[in-house]
Amino acid sequence: MVIDPRDFLLSSYDYELNSSLIAQEPIEPRHNARMLHVSKRSGEGLKAFHLKVWDLLAELRAGDLLVMNDTRVLKARLKVRLRNGTFVELFLLEPKGQGRWLCLAKPAKKLRAGDCIWMESSGEESIPLKIIDQDISTGGRIVQFPELFSDRRKIEPLLEKFGEIPLPPYINRCDFKDVNRYQTRYASTPGAVAAPTAGLHLSDQFLEALSQQGIKDAKVTLHVGLGTFRPLVEENLANLHLHSEWVEVKEEVVSAIKECRDRGGRVIAIGTTTVRSLEASFLAGDGCLKPFKGEVDLVIKPGYKFGIVDGLLTNFHLPKSSLLLLVSALIGRENLLELYKEAIDQKYRFFSYGDAMFISPEGVLPSARL
C-alpha cells in the first residue's frame, strides 16, 4: 500500500452528511437493515453491491468464523443532585478501584473536589457520592461510589435502578425499547458505555441460520468507551493516541481461530471493536495470537498490517473518527470516501442505529495483510 501523506491528516476523513440520514430508530427485524457489500472482481477495482444484512449469510461459507464483541451496555447515564438542589448529569466511563469511577459531567464546572452529590430514584431512595478530583486527560471527574460498587459487574444492579441507557447525542429521543434494542442479542459481559453497533444487526434468526450453515462464532470482550467514540481533534494523526479500553480474548477464542485457519476458513469480525481486540491480542503475543486480558489503546490506521482479521461487518461512522481510520486501513482512504459517497447517494442510514457495510476478504487491500 502506498501511503499518502493525506492519510495522516484528520481533515482527510471529513465528509458531509444530511441530518436526515442519521438513523433515529432501529430497523426491525434487525437483519433487515441495508448492507453495502464491498468486494472485488478479478482484474477490477472495488465494487459495491446493495444488499440486506440477512444476505451476509450467502456471502459466508462453512468453515468461516464470526467473532463478536459480547460487551453489555451499562445504564451509565445518571442524574445527580447537588447540595443546592440543582441537578448535574454524570456519564460513567470506567472504574478506578475502591469504588471510584471516572465520569464525564455536564455541566462539569458545577462539580469541584470535595463536593457531595446524591443519586436519587423515583422511589425516593438516595445514595450519597463524593467528587474526589478532576481528571486532566478527559476533563472528567473521579467520583467516589460506595466501595461495594468497585467494578463493572458489581455496579450494574445499581445502575439498573438509577441510570439510563446512554444513547449517542445524535439520537434525539429516549425510549423504553432502547433498553433492549441498544444491546446485541449476545451481550453478556457488563461494562460498555456505548454499544458495539455492528452487532446490533444480528437477530436471533440470523444467529440460528448461521449455526445451521456450519458457520461457527466466538466472543471477545471490549468494553466500549472513550477510545472508540471520542471525537479526534488533532489534525496530525501520525502520533495519534487513544484512550485505553478493557479487552479480554479467552483461550477458547484463540483455539477457535486456529481451528478456522486449519480448515481453510476466514475470520470475519463483527465490528471495529472486535478488530481491535483481536489485533491487540496478536500484537501482545509478538505476532502469535494468545489469550489476552488488559487495557488496549491500539490505533489502527492506513499502513497497518492485519494479522488476524480477514473481513469486517461494520456501521457507517462519524466524520473525523478513529473508526474511519481503521476501515481505511483495510480498504484505503480514497476507496472509503467513495463508498461513503455512494452510500449517501443511495440514502443509507448512518451511525449507531443505521445500516451496515460488509468488507469481504476479497475487498481488503492485499497490502493491508501481513
Curated annotation (Swiss-Prot):
Q: Please provide the record's keywords in A-Z order.
A: Cytoplasm, Queuosine biosynthesis, S-adenosyl-L-methionine, Transferase
Protein's UniProt name: S-adenosylmethionine:tRNA ribosyltransferase-isomerase
Q: How does it assemble?
A: Monomer.
The answer to keyword Transit peptide applying to this record is no
- What superkingdom heads the lineage? Bacteria
Q: List the disulfide bonds.
A: none
Q: Which NCBIfam families match?
A: PRK00147.1 (NF001140), queA (TIGR00113)
Q: What is the lineage of its organism?
A: Bacteria, Bacillati, Cyanobacteriota, Cyanophyceae, Synechococcales
Q: Which organism's genome codes for this protein?
A: Prochlorococcus marinus (strain SARG / CCMP1375 / SS120)
* EC code(s) of this entry: 2.4.99.17
User: In which broad location class does this protein mainly occur, judging by the first location in its UniProt entry?
Assistant: cytoplasm
Output the GO biological process annotations, alphabetical, semicolon-separated: queuosine biosynthetic process; tRNA wobble guanine modification
List the molecular function annotations (GO) for this entry: S-adenosylmethionine:tRNA ribosyltransferase-isomerase activity
Q: Which GO terms describe its cellular component?
A: cytoplasm
